[in-house]
């Protein structure tokens, strides 16, 4: 019986727009930001940023180092990065509120402080309450200094939540993350970004 749901954020709760953010970085003199940006797991200094190994300031300095324009501002970098994320859709917000009445909801996300701050601010502007109110706990890679698909982050999250993996549904769009969670006994749902959110979640809960 499913008691807990662990949601990924980017690609599951929040739609991603990779091309839009790559175009924004190109306008800042960075032609190869795609070498670092991945919908599932970042690379290079971006991976270190999401793992909490470097600060937002250090991340921005790394961006400037690969740009043809060393004078780009913090705001320009943040805005370009945040274009990767669409707002959380209304039907997903409504379903999370509904699920919260029956299940213990958690966020388990490879994330960074720039994007996470942006999502929280945008969510509150759109819905009038804080994103964190939907969840028992929000597990973010940059705060935990560990990232999916490492088993460590799953085990740490389960321990903090006091949850049993066999009673926990994990929803993610990354096959590697799903494989890692399944190996630890989670009930899993490989999310398809081309299919409706509510339909996939309801099916996963029914099958679990």
PLM feature spans:
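Structured helix-beta-strand junction loops
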Residues: 101-102, 134
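Structured, non-catalytic alpha/beta "coupling" segments that mediate domain-domain communication
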Residues: 104-108, 112-114
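N-terminal helical cap/lid subdomain that shapes the substrate entry/recognition surface
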Residues: 2-90, 101, 112, 203
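A generic structural motif
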Residues: 102-104, 186
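Generic structural signal for small/hydrophobic residues in well-ordered secondary structure
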Residues: 8-11, 52, 99, 107, ...
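Short, flexible loop segments at the rims of nucleotide/cofactor-binding pockets, characterized by
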Residues: 82-86, 117, 146
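Asp-based, Mg2+/Mn2+-dependent phosphohydrolase catalytic module
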Residues: 1-3, 113, 119-208
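Alpha-helical elements of Rossmann-like donor-binding domains used by nucleotide-donor carbohydrate transfer enzymes
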Residues: 20-23, 44, 58, 62, ...
């Amino acid at each position: 019986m499913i008691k807990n749901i662990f949601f990924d954020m980017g690609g599951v709760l929040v739609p991603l727009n990779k091309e839009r953010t790559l175009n924004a970085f190109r306008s800042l003199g960075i032609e190869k930001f795609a070498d670092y940006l991945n919908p599932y797991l970042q690379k290079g200094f971006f991976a270190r940023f999401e793992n909490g190994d470097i600060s937002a300031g250090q991340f921005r300095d790394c961006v400037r180092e690969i740009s043809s324009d060393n004078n780009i501002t913090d705001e320009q970098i943040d805005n370009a990065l945040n274009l990767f994320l669409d707002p959380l859709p209304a039907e997903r917000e409504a379903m999370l509120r509904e699920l919260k009445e029956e299940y213990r909801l958690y966020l388990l996300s490879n994330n960074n402080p720039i994007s996470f701050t942006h999502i929280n601010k945008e969510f509150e502007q759109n819905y009038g309450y804080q994103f964190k109110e939907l969840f028992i706990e929000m597990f973010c890679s940059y705060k935990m200094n560990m990232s999916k698909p490492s088993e460590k982050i799953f085990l740490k999250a389960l321990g903090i939540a006091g949850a049993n993996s066999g009673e926990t549904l994990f929803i993610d769009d990354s096959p590697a993350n799903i494989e890692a969670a399944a190996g630890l006994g989670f009930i899993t749902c490989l999310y398809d970004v081309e299919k409706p959110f509510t339909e996939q979640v309801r099916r996963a809960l029914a099958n679990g």
